[in-house]
Amino acid sequence: MALWGGRFTQAADQRFKQFNDSLRFDYRLAEQDIVGSVAWSKALVTVGVLTADEQRQLEEALNVLLEEVRVNPQQILQSDAEDIHSWVEGKLIDKVGQLGKKLHTGRSRNDQVATDLKLWCKETVRELLTANRQLQSALVETAQANQDAVMPGYTHLQRAQPVTFAHWCLAYVEMLARDESRLQDTLKRLDVSPLGCGALAGTAYEIDREQLAGWLGFASATRNSLDSVSDRDHVLELLSDAAIGMVHLSRFAEDLIFFNSGEAGFVELSDRVTSGSSLMPQKKNPDALELIRGKCGRVQGALTGMMMTLKGLPLAYNKDMQEDKEGLFDALDTWLDCLHMAALVLDGIQVKRPRCQDAAQQGYANATELADYLVAKGVPFREAHHIVGEAVVEAIRQGKPLEALPLADLQKFSHVIGDDVYPMLSLQSCLDKRAAKGGVSPQQVAQAIDDARARLAL
């Protein structure tokens, strides 16, 4: 039976019912709805709506229902209830009879669903934080094992300067640390309870909403009933967190797809995260990474869609807000899955050090070192930049790396160049000189790994 049928003289058209009902997706809020109902039953005792014995009966029945849901959540989908609130109330009435009809006193589905969703979001954020830190840990461990793997760093997808595979891993640790910080920040704003705000104007019963918030594990209660039932900022924030986080994972995936390609050949992915071709027997495709990259778009779409849904809504609750859940559930599920999959990709990855080093020695990645050498000899940097550009053109003409050019050829471009230039052009020198904080020198990379291990308690 619908929770609102008394006002109507005709039954809803079945097509409208299917269009209107939300149980097919909000069934995921079952546990939160039951937990919120237990807390609400306690609040009703404090204002004399329920006796202590009635509340005990309701709580016992709700706890039984909670266990049933945990064992078999799919049972909910066999019902024709309108939404999860209707389903829980119907099941409660089945268990305790007329007493179950007293539970909704002073409560609206508006504050009820807002509470359910915040509880679900809090739990999901904790799962995301755990997965995020697991991926950070996997990256740190991979960095630890590959501090000596020199490879080219890129700008514009052109070889630029030598870096290490460890330094590359640590770049993504930094991105994930920012994602972690955003989630922690979002969690603070999630931690206020809307329960007790009614449909929009507050509840008619003098319930202690701060006490009620505490029973549900919230830090405090919201301050304005109109805002409380219409607020979906937390949905937007989480979708934004997910969108940014998925951009980071997509870039991670794109880098590794390139590193794994025959053109680069820097890494080989485990058989456990790759697949083959139905036609070409030789293929080993990076499907896990391509799916991470591909799934980024649907998360961006969920954020954009939710913004468009909310932008024109007047206060307070509108049925449009029912559209908040499917996109949110899918986006956070997707982000969580991709965090786990990215960690799995790193488990078993093989870094091909000789190929990485060979690539780092090509493409004149040490050209900046020659410019810095000239600066140390008193040549202004802009002039040094031009000189080295000319030297690179000559090296290309001769088909040699810079360090293979004879001294006489180098001195054609600047008389200050001496024999001491050659050690400066080695890969190791290129790395060693980047010794400022955040640089790629072995000492800085080792320190960054130690710092990350300490922060992650590894």
UniProtKB/Swiss-Prot annotation:
Enzyme class: lyase
Major subcellular site: cytoplasm
Keyword Membrane in record: no
One of the GO BP terms on file: L-arginine biosynthetic process
Any Gene Ontology CC annotation: cytosol
E.C. numbers: 4.3.2.1
Pathway info: Amino-acid biosynthesis; L-arginine biosynthesis; L-arginine from L-ornithine and carbamoyl phosphate: step 3/3
Reaction(s) the record says it catalyses: 2-(N(omega)-L-arginino)succinate = fumarate + L-arginine
One Gene Ontology molecular-function label: argininosuccinate lyase activity
Keywords: Amino-acid biosynthesis, Arginine biosynthesis, Cytoplasm, Lyase
Top-rank lineage group of the source organism: Bacteria
Localization: Cytoplasm
InterPro entries found in the cross-reference section: Arg_succ_lyase_C, Argininosuccinate_lyase, Fumarase/histidase_N, Fumarate_lyase_CS, Fumarate_lyase_fam, Fumarate_lyase_N, L-Aspartase-like
One Pfam family of this chain: Lyase_1
Signal sequence region: none
Family indicated by similarity: Belongs to the lyase 1 family. Argininosuccinate lyase subfamily.
The name this protein goes by in its record: Argininosuccinate lyase
Organism in which the protein naturally occurs: Salmonella dublin (strain CT_02021853)
